[in-house]
Amino acid sequence: MQPEIKIKRMKKRVFKILEMTAFQSQQNIIATDYSKTIITPSRLKIENDRLQIEITYYDEGQTITEKSKKYMVTIQLVQLIDPGEFQKYVDGNNRDYDPGSAIQALNIILSKAPTNDPAIIPNGRSKFFVNSDPRPLGKGLVALRGYYSSIRPSISRILCNVNVCMTAFYRETDVATLIYEFTGASPGATIPPNIYGRLGGFLKRLRISTSHIKGPNGKPKVQAKAIIGIGHGRAAKDIKFMCEEFAKEVSIPEYFKRKYNITLRHPNLPCVDVGTRDMPIMLPPEIATVLPGQAYGNKLMDEQTAHMITYACRNPKENAGFIVGEGLTSLGLNPPTPHLGPFNIQVSTEMITVPARILTPPTIKYANSTMAVIGASWNLRNVKFAQGASTENFGVIVLEETGGRAQLDWSGVAANFRDMCNKSGMRVGATSPQLMRAVSIPYPNERSTASLEKAISPAFAHMQAKKPKIILVFLPTTDKAVYSMVKYLGDVKYGISTVCAQSSKISKMSPQYMANVALKFNLKLMGRNHGLPPADLGMLAEGTTMIVGCDVTHPSPGSLRGTPSIAGVVASVDAHFAQWPASLRLQESRKEMISGLKEMMIERLQRWNSVNGKFPQRIIVYRDGVSEGQFQTVIKEELPLIRAACQQCGDSKYRPKISIIIVGKRHHTRFYPTDKDKADRLGNPAPGTVVDRGVTAVYDFDFYLQAHSGLQGTTRPAHYYVIHDKNDFKSNQLQTLTHNLCYLFGRATKSVSICPPAYYADLVCERGRCYIYGLLNAPDTASLHSSNSEEEAAANFKKAVGLWGDGPHPNLLNTMYYL
């Protein structure tokens, strides 16, 4: 396509114009991704399999003018896909065949119906949303229910994976109403200028339509524009400019009244800029209407997230009903749409049935008892930790919001917690805590990274002088900015482990809540909460295996350009698999593979050696955060780094047996029990359910394991995919080992959804995000007219490196500070 188009919306429009012109007579027998690929059931009758077409671009609802831009589109044959070869692949007769193109083609064909249905909103290549039942999320957003669809090859059959999904969209209304909803201001109120930055970020790239300008025929001319920011940081009534047409300086309201006979109802609102950096165009928001079907790409606020979870939470029966009912209809699969016929595609409208097994839960051991597991959980009543940690004293910091509630007896609360620790088998000094500090933190609208550090840091400095092993911090709010500052100060700046508790909860002195906080206390002081008997550890009981968890977390929407990704590696060190110290690094933004893996593995191997007096004979790696398309990259890039770390640590003959298992948790496979006796109270599969046939890979070893019991809604199993295995695991052996590990998550009294090494790796990466919180959550003044320059990205990366320093303090490197 020449000239090149980078904007997806425009590229899609070019393909739409092609469908209506060059391919008008063939619309029913072609499918496209509206980006660069066209799929046809047979070869097009064009000379030399190549065709060049000039098209004139115009937006939907507009007409071609003399200024309309022209594009040269080249269509050429790039590949012939043989369905027979794909069938041989799924039948197990052609392992060397690459199914990628066939899968892509089938996905494009299946997406044609929902993509072209005016009642459906496509979002990405595989999600399609129904625009008939919007649920309010607040702050100008709504949640829409949609359906995910993707082709999955399995043994002897090709499957279509369908699942329900929900996403936030901008509410379809005028932009003035949207502004009032987002800011929480009453209609007619003035918006404080200090909110303009955040408002601009919310509106940036939002597409709107206007109709205040009349065309040659005298009728309103509908124009589509994109908002690039907030205009001039002032209300419309306060903006004046020299108008050549009226030969005088006029305000925005005066101009629209004289030019278009429009009296602005909200002159106190800021204008939206729909121009460019060099040539801004200001529009009063009340004359702009949000175009439908625009997904919100930034991070939701806590309250919005809570609403989203409520809407998305459906029991298994209801979830399955949506899929086979509204889902298949929305996707054009039931009844099947005509476009499937030319491709000779038929999709069954019934869910497939697959075999499953339920693994037996392990025995949970404490110092004084074994616990019965019921529904994948147990309680802490009258038990002592398997190995209680000791400390003569601990510090307490009480954070209070300025003007907050009256002072409670925090010394009494802390003493109650001390007693709970001792009751649970820890040894905490009878006079603890001797160190207590109360700290007032700024009001929410006055909080910044700098103001929070200024308020809280002196308390840590005071504590550091007294050298407590650990500090208990009472938080007055769930504000992540406050939590992140506490963790930054404790982990990075002062090197003191911290445990946070919500003031509103711990002040009630509930034994259950106190006991749960004590779980973290004991682990961070290098104790052991519970364990499994040797029989349930299997080969792990030999004491020669190090289990590793790896993950990478990337900047979230709203982060400043160039903000680094964070890589984390955790590894077991003891025979009970209770302690998992970690290595943590910044790396290039959005890089999937772990750059510093060799050095991080060396740190983990050296720590294992210092505890055990030898290096492990086996290494089992659970790698989180990797998509299917990157499995081979892990083998090619990360496996050699692990081997190199081993060679550097041991002698020349040191060659531990390495296995790498990818942990998938963001997939769309769900299971619905056919037998009520094999279901839990919600109708989900019983904890311990494992599926390794029917929906798994054709040639490789993978399985789905639901080790946990869901609290609500439809549970999602973890997907484990073995990409390298020199330990020669039998399928049941690895499944049982992974399942039993899920009962060893130290800070819970239940089995967890993914095995602890992957879970801990995720947690340590999340902890790293606290250290660069300000970059990951850009302030209101973040550039709205960003140049997206490499210089800007480099500056932000450098700032992150400065905040990060050397990362977690040396005092904490051998502890589970990240819990």
Language model feature labels by segment:
Residues 1-819:
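Long, low-complexity, intrinsically disordered terminal regions
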